[in-house]
């Protein structure tokens, strides 16, 4: 009734002023956000009773002072007159947590057993303190109790849930309380509901101390005023506007730490009844070009504390769904991403935006593709993009697994050293329309999709060069053998190449892939010394040509005990026209390990595959020869073929599945099946052939010096104790390679 008296008798207003306030002009100037119809007294009574019942519905009690040996059954017997929903006894602390049917039973149990005795020990019974009570404020006044329960129920089991109504009008004051069974449910509800838009309002959620919440403190004394005019900063004008009924004890505009206005203000009145009368009068009042919206704050804290809490809640609501750091702009994103990722981000809408109808960062996509092929357009745009960020990339480039960054080697205005399909390898036998190229850097990886050596020259692609041994691959992906070699007598300077996979250490020269655009994957440099020591002719473009060694001519398909040796010499002559002074041709020696091979060719034996030296004239001819000669079926126990052939096959694993002579047979027939000569594709992904003078590079076991030059490569396995035979019960290459690898790994 105090609220009615204060509203009826308004000391600051005279009857004339009150009449003036009720004039249509003044009424028209008020535009509250929601006009609620008046309620009948019965509805008001029901709402108030529900709020009081829910407020008192604290049914959890805490019993202290229990004996140390008390049991759960004793507590049930003690509270036998009540309906227990939950009971937990802590014997170490002598306490019991009990949940009864409702708040009335809890109040009755407290009145009955508080300060009573159990086994000569005095008990203390009281309500359990709760830390899972939330106050949800800034609700729409038209929100019903059922809608409020539906809003807060999804986050966990509710202990209490009620709205706070005006005792005079019965309308909601725009805030309510929700208590959960568990604190984590309340924390989840606070996190999800804070800043959530509900109709025209944004929810504010606060923790509430249930111990300090009384029926009198359910009603708030603070008001929140928003919808202020833009840039409004006159606190005195706001105070006068809301002092028509009662003068507030606290009035302040919200400002951030940077001094920026937040667009709302907080006012505090002496009593909850004064605050209710001021809210009813000022809600929708015109101030400047805006109509104020006045709502109740959460009850409890004073006005100054509530202002700080609302500022923090507004900042949290504005940052809802965002990270702790500000969102980076497009320029920062492109700078942090690599050139390839930035290019893909920019090109995807252009290349594929026509189907989706969306415009990308570069605008609407063209009606036709930029270039005839996506690979060509990507490469050209990548070069253009890199030329713009040259200074940045040079300061940040770091060597990767395969060496320096490929983008860091681009120079401004430099042209690519090869076409998108790669450069052809140097050597004789090129087609007339393709002149031989000399001194080109050679990538480490072999041609994966290129045709075999026997088919390259008819196609006009020219013969490839030697490659280091990569991991094994399917038969259809094997590369070509080492054939046509340059006959020039002087080195030529080579421009630095660009690789898509990075630049490796600077001491490799290997052949180039004409199909996968892997030009200069490993740049060429510092191989002058190693090329003369049996690198399979990889450095022949930088040495003066030497006369080839004389070798007897071998008829194609020859047989006999010396056919293998002759074929070996013939192949060495055809493959290696440039002889080495340090590798005299001695194919008949039984111990091929005596040759002066470099110690750093050991890693080439990894996954290596021997050539077929007994194939006779199936060498680098352009013809598809018929099946292998009869020398395949002859034993190699003596004679001229016993020396190099036995060593060539005994210690050379050919692949994961075959070894020795069986691999040569299978390799020959597989290559014949795919339309290439056996010798033409015998050295692809799975193998390497003999060196410049016909001696296999596979004869050399890696020595200790290998660690200094090629410590980053896997060591090669020792020669298999089973030789070239792999039978049904043979251990095979896999087990032997694992054993030898473990033994050699201990050396490093």
Swiss-Prot record:
UniProt subcellular location: Nucleus; Cytoplasm
Record's compositionally biased regions (Low complexity): 675-685
Region (Interaction with PTBP1): 307-401
Gene Ontology MF terms in the entry: RNA binding
Keywords: Acetylation, Cytoplasm, Nucleus, Phosphoprotein, Repeat, RNA-binding
Assembly, per entry: Interacts with PTBP1, RAVER2, VCL and ACTN1. Part of a complex containing RAVER1, VCL and ACTN1.
Protein name per Swiss-Prot or TrEMBL: Ribonucleoprotein PTB-binding 1
Native source organism of the sequence: Mus musculus
